[in-house]
Structures are given as C-alpha cells and as structure tokens.
C-alpha cells in the first residue's frame, strides 16, 4: 500500500460473513497481543451484507501494518506499507 493512497476492501460477499477485516501494527492483531490500528480506517456495515466495506487511507509515516480477522486468530498477514 502506498502513502497517501486510499484503499477500499469490499466485504459485501457472503464469504466475508463473520470475518471483519481490521488492521494492527502487531502480527495477528488483537489475537497477538496488539491493538486495532484505526488511523485513517473507516468501516461500514456488517461483513457479508450489501454495502459492507473497510477503507484505509495510508498516511505518510504509517508503520508496517498487518491485516487480520477480528474474530478468528490466524486469519491475516502483513500488508505492504511503506
């Protein structure tokens, strides 16, 4: 992901039900002892429902981020941030 860019992750497909996408500076997010990263992040709706999305605007100086499912441990990875 590039600094200054905005990314929208469409979570409206039924396969996303029960898998809210979140970001953290810690691998595996809150499951790995970290906290949710919320700077520039907007969520809308319920994953698996029409109109659901997670949006992030990557600010200058954003640290390395990890994406994860806030419900299930082990569902995520590193997002390539500057």
PLM region descriptions:
Residues 26-40:
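Acidic Ser/Thr/Pro-rich low-complexity disordered segments
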Residues 1-5, 81:
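GGW-centered surface loops in extracellular recognition modules
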Residues 15-18, 39-82:
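Extracellular/periplasmic metallocenter environments
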Residues 18-30, 81:
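Short, surface-exposed beta-strand/strand-loop-strand elements in extracellular ectodomains
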Residues 8-12:
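Short edge beta-strand/loop segments characteristic of extracellular beta-sandwich folds
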Residues 13, 31-34, 47:
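Low-complexity, compositionally biased segments
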Residues 7, 27-29, 62-64:
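A generic structural micro-environment signature
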């Amino acid at each position: 992901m590039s600094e200054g860019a905005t990314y929208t992750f469409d979570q409206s497909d039924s396969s996303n039900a029960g898998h809210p996408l979140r970001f953290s500076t810690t691998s595996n997010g809150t499951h790995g002892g970290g906290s949710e990263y919320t700077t520039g992040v907007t969520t809308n709706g319920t994953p698996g429902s029409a109109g659901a999305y997670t949006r992030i605007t990557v600010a200058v100086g954003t640290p390395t981020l990890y994406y994860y499912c806030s419900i299930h441990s082990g569902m995520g990875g590193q997002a390539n941030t500057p």
